């Protein structure tokens, strides 16, 4: 019988101030926030230039063998070989709140303009007929 605990990844290093669980909880819970509190620092829209995000990235890269070490079932009990599975790189793409509001405002404006243009065009066609020259003269 195989124990599940032998296949679970080992816990991350405790000497880092940013732990893997806190980083992942921040990534999943605050994707739409303007300020992301990672390791006690404020991460605004300049996520790539933040030193704490660099520390998180370096932490994930340095602890990769610890997080991805699994016992090799084909190896004999005398040798302690393990295989290393590469983990994906952590990438956070979060638009700022102002960018999201601006994009929504642009979408609403375009929808309103297109809707009004269709209504105005249909009203002109009903009043002045469907001839293009009559429609331009009415403008």
UniProtKB/Swiss-Prot annotation:
Source organism, top-level taxon: Eukaryota
Location relative to the cell: Membrane
GO cellular component: membrane
Recorded topology in the membrane: Single-pass membrane protein
TM annotation in the entry: 22-38
Keyword vocabulary terms for this entry: Membrane, Transmembrane, Transmembrane helix
Predominant cellular place of this UniProt entry's protein: membrane
Further comment found in the protein's record: Almost completely overlaps YPL113C.
Protein name as catalogued: Putative uncharacterized protein YPL114W
């Amino acid at each position: 019988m195989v124990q599940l605990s032998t296949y679970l990844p080992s816990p991350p290093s405790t000497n880092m101030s940013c732990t893997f669980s806190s980083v992942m909880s921040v990534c999943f819970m605050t994707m739409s926030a303007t300020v992301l509190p990672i390791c006690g620092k404020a991460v605004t829209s300049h996520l790539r230039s933040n030193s704490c995000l660099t520390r998180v990235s370096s932490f994930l890269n340095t602890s990769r063998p610890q997080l991805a070490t699994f016992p090799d079932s084909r190896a004999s009990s005398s040798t302690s070989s393990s295989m290393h599975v590469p983990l994906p790189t952590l990438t956070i793409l979060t638009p700022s709140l102002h960018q999201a509001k601006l994009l929504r405002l642009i979408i609403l404006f375009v929808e309103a303009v297109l809707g009004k243009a269709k209504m105005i065009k249909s009203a002109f066609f009903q009043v002045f007929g469907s001839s293009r020259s009559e429609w331009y003269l009415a403008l």
